[in-house]
Structure formats: structure tokens, C-alpha cells
Amino acid sequence: MNAIILAAGLGSRFKDITQSTHKSLLDIHGTPNLERTLTFLRQANIDNIVIVTGYLHEQFEYLKKKYDCTLIYNEKYREYNSIYSFSLAQDFFNDCYVIDADVVLNRNIFLTKPSHSKYFTVIRSKTHNEWLPILNSNGQVIRIDIGSLNQPSLSGISFWTTQDCNIILTLLKEYTSEVRLKNPKLYWDTIPMEYIEKLNIYTEQLNSDDIFEMDNLDDYHHILQKLTPNKEK
């Protein structure tokens, strides 16, 4: 099994704090957040871990030796969206997790290997333009809506079987034109979303205290309060 971690972003909504520290490396009670995720992946015996870096890429160098992971530098992180980051790591996209680097985990969700592709979902306390998977009676995702309803939304972590990886990789070339890569409204997740009927993907809903979104300083401070050391699992 593999894991691709997308960590090229600027984190501009954090203002001054991310001028000197990448948002995925912000400290969570003594440990950079990304190291928490890497520790969980190693505990789950994930074979190959690749981190796609960009902004402040030099800050990730120490992770190569510490966690035996691969770093890929996206030099176009300022001009291209995450589809380009994903394309740089496509050789690893096989029986694979894809993880947003700024996701904060409070539990190791990687210990049981999924039997099929899945989106990990969560009901967020605050909702705004969330990606909401719509399921059929068998629990299979048949489409993804974008909205602010109080229902399970994509958490920033997904798993893809080899079969679905191959389908997505075949579609990837449709998204690598300059126009699409420079469109800030497109993400790597846009590819499976627009071709969901070709994929065999389900969901696993996490508890609200299993996973947190870290989009801005308010989120960060909220997470620090929620994850006091004696509350962590």
C-alpha cells in the first residue's frame, strides 16, 4: 500500500504564522502535525509514502530519513492547482491513500486496510461549500454535491484500489492542460468527482473528534484546545 500526501500549498489564510512554518508542520502539543500523520501511516505498515512539497519545501527534508519517505518538489506550487501535485506523484498512485497534509488526525484510521475505494467523511461543526457524497441504497457514492448542509462531507483523506487508480490515471491527461492546471477552482479530487460513475467508491464516516480541518488560525487554535495531550488517543 502507498500514501500520497499533498503538501505544496501556501497556507495564505494563516497570515504571518505560515511565513516561517509550513501549515502542515505547525506544532500540535510538541509534534509537527504532519509527523503525527506519518507516525500513523508507519504504524499501519504503509509501504511507500510520498510527500509532494512546494512552499517552504526545504522544511520537509528531515522527514526523508526520519520516516523513510520520498519527497517530490512541485516548483509550480504558486501557479498550478493540486492536480499538478497529484500528477507528479502518479507513479505511486496504486492501492493508495491520498491525504491533504493539513488534515489533523486524533486516531489512527489507517490500521484496517479498506476492501474497496473509500472517502473518509465527517460531519463538520461549521459547514461552508463542503463536498458532500451522495450514496445509493448499497452505500456506493453516485455523485458529489457541493453545499453547506449538515451531513457527512469529504475529510481530505481517501483510499483508492488499484482498479480505481488505473481509471483515474487514464482520466488524468484530460486535466493537465495549462488552462485546467491554472484554474484555482479545480482540485485533484475534481477528477474522481466528475467521473464518479466509473468508480467503485464507498464512504467511512469518522467521528467529529477523529479528524479536524486546519484551514486558518481559528481552526488551529480550536484544534489545540480539543487535542489537549490527555485527550489524545
From Swiss-Prot:
The keyword Metal-binding applies. Keywords: Lipopolysaccharide biosynthesis, Magnesium, Metal-binding, Nucleotidyltransferase, Transferase. The keyword rRNA processing does not apply. Its cofactor is Mg(2+). GO terms for molecular function: metal ion binding; nucleotidyltransferase activity. Cytidylyltransferase involved in the biosynthesis of lipopolysaccharides (LPS), a necessary component and antigenic determinant of the outer membrane that has been shown to be an important factor in the host-parasite interaction in a number of Gram-negative species. Catalyzes the activation of phosphocholine (P-Cho) to CDP-choline (CDP-Cho). LicC is critical for the expression of the 6A2-specific epitope. Its EC number is 2.7.7.15. It catalyses: phosphocholine + CTP + H(+) = CDP-choline + diphosphate. One of its GO terms (biological process) is lipopolysaccharide biosynthetic process. It comes from the Bacteria. CDP-choline binds at L6, A8, G9, Y80, S85, A101, Y187. Coiled coil: none annotated. This is Choline-phosphate cytidylyltransferase. Mg(2+) binds at D102, E213, D215. Belongs to the LicC/PntC cytidylyltransferase family. It is an enzyme of class 2 (transferase). The gene is licC. Pathway: Lipopolysaccharide biosynthesis.
